[in-house]
């Protein structure tokens, strides 16, 4: 039995894992148990506790669907097996033109295999908006023209964090410092355009930027 700790909030993904379990059982006699979690940080905490207790074999977690923040935490705490990715039969099918060698700017070093591709996509109704903003600068102008309409999910919700990451990348023209470990010396300078933008945006955002949606719905 393989215990796979993964977010359980998508019915489509849950259905896929149930299908994968049936395939594994019929072809290899292996049972895949989907351990549904709300936040993968729960699994990070569990692994740290098991390691501290000296439980180096027979633990409760075999595989984990992990995000960049928790990948870095697990890597720093030496909780990950590997490197292993080049031993995977499917590795040759992975599109190496994608940034599979880093996660949230943290080098993966073969300790993490791609599970999917996450992209921030803005969707609009062409019947009501036929000329949508094509940049964050245009989005700010749109928000000022139509106040109290736009917002973003409150970080650390994934889409809210992704919104801010994409914003700071555009505003700084992908400053090289953003791909390095953060330090106090350049943080204020590099991120200044972000805070200036948000100060302007929040003035005209939904509920004046005092409240934020909890998710994307």
Q: What is each residue range found by the language model?
A:
Residues 52-66, 76, 80-126:
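A structural signal for short loop-to-beta-strand junctions that line the ligand-binding cleft
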Residues 27-28, 51-55, 68, 75-78, ...:
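Sec/Tat-exported extracytoplasmic proteins
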Residues 129-145:
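Flexible hinge/capping segments at coil-to-helix
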Residues 3-6, 33-36, 62-65, 114, ...:
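Structural recognition of the beta-strand scaffold that forms the well-ordered cores
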Residues 5-6, 107-113, 120, 144-178:
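Extracytoplasmic/periplasmic solute-binding protein
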Residues 27-29, 42, 108, 117-119, ...:
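Extracytoplasmic
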């Amino acid at each position: 039995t393989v215990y796979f700790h993964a977010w359980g909030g998508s019915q489509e993904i849950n259905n896929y894992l149930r299908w994968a379990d049936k395939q594994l059982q019929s072809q290899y006699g292996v049972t895949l148990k989907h351990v549904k979690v709300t936040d993968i940080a729960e699994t990070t905490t569990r692994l740290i506790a098991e390691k501290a207790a000296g439980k180096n074999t027979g633990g409760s977690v075999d595989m984990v669907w992990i995000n960049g923040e928790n990948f870095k935490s697990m890597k720093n705490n030496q909780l990950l097996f590997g490197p292993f990715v080049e031993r995977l039969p499917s590795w040759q099918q992975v599109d190496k033109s994608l940034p599979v060698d880093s996660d949230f700017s943290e080098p993966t070093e073969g300790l993490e295999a791609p599970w999917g591709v996450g992209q921030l996509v803005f969707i609009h109704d062409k019947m009501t908006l036929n000329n949508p903003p094509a940049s964050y600068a245009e989005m700010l102008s749109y928000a000022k023209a139509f106040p109290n309409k736009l917002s973003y999910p409150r970080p650390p919700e994934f889409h809210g964090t992704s919104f801010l990451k994409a914003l700071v990348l555009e505003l700084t023209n992908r400053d090289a410092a953003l791909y390095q470990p953060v330090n106090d010396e350049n943080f204020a300078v590099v991120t200044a355009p972000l805070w200036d933008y948000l100060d302007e945006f929040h003035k005209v955002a939904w509920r004046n930027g005092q409240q934020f949606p909890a998710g994307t719905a």
